[in-house]
């Protein structure tokens, strides 16, 4: 079966840390597929993920609008529209917006654990429109 979703019809998740929101297009809840997690993300100017890594998970960002920096142990690199960022499993990283940022995110498999190295547990909490909280694993 094929799944077709429109972003305006899907639930938006808003980070408990201001400036970040996401919409999942592929998740276990939407498709009964747990092999990957995919969706779009929007960051306000200056918003950032915590410095973190994912155990057992490859991570991709495709930047569609805006400018950002990607921080890894190798340094900080500026990225913008058309750039694809690949983060291997267990690679430490942080994405920080320079301008309002819009990007597509893909993680596989969706059976992973996130470890925060610089940030707080609140960085993994996302509020759903129904008031429930989704905790990023």
Language-model features and meaning:
Residues 64-65, 80-81, 99:
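A cytosolic small-molecule/anion-sensing beta-strand core signal
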Residues 39-54:
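Conserved short histidine dyad/triad with adjacent acidic residue
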Residues 71-75, 98:
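Short strand-coil-strand connectors
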Residues 56-58, 62-68:
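Glycine- and acidic-residue-biased ligand/ion/polar-headgroup-sensing regions
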Residues 32, 89-115:
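Ligand-binding loop in jelly-roll beta-barrel domains
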């Amino acid at each position: 079966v094929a799944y077709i979703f429109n972003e305006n019809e899907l639930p938006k998740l808003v980070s408990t840390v201001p400036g970040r929101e996401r919409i999942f297009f592929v998740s276990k809840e939407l498709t009964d597929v747990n092999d990957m997690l995919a969706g779009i993300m929007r960051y306000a100017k200056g918003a950032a993920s915590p410095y973190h890594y994912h155990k057992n998970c490859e991570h991709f960002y495709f930047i569609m609008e805006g400018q950002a920096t990607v921080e890894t142990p190798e340094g900080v690199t500026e990225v913008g529209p058309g750039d694809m960022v690949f983060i291997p499993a267990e690679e430490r990283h942080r994405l920080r917006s320079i301008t309002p940022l819009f990007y597509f995110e893909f993680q596989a498999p969706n059976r992973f654990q996130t470890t925060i190295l610089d940030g707080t547990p609140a960085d993994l909490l996302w509020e759903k429109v129904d008031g429930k909280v989704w905790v990023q694993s």
